[in-house]
Amino acid sequence: GLFSVVTGVLKAVGKNVAKNVGGSLLEQLKCKISGGC
C-alpha cells in the first residue's frame, strides 16, 4: 500500500544521500592525500 511506497522512496533517498556524502568525503581524502587542497 501507500506505506510501502513511502518506505521505498525514503530508502532510495537515503541511499542517494549516503552515496553523495560518501563521495564528497572520499574526494576530500584524496585531496588531502595528494596535497591538492
From Swiss-Prot:
Q: Which residues form the signal peptide?
A: none
Subcellular localization(s) per the UniProt record: Secreted
Tissue occurrence = Expressed by the skin glands.
Q: Does the keyword Disulfide bond apply?
A: yes
Instruction: Note the InterPro entries from the entry.
Output: Antimicrobial_frog_2
Domain of life from the UniProt record: Eukaryota
Q: List the disulfide bonds.
A: 31-37
Query: Which biological processes are named by the entry's GO terms?
Result: defense response to bacterium
Q: What family does the database annotate?
A: Belongs to the frog skin active peptide (FSAP) family. Brevinin subfamily.
Which protein are we looking at? Brevinin-2DYe
Q: Which organism is it from?
A: Rana dybowskii
Organism placement in taxonomy: Eukaryota, Metazoa, Chordata, Craniata, Vertebrata
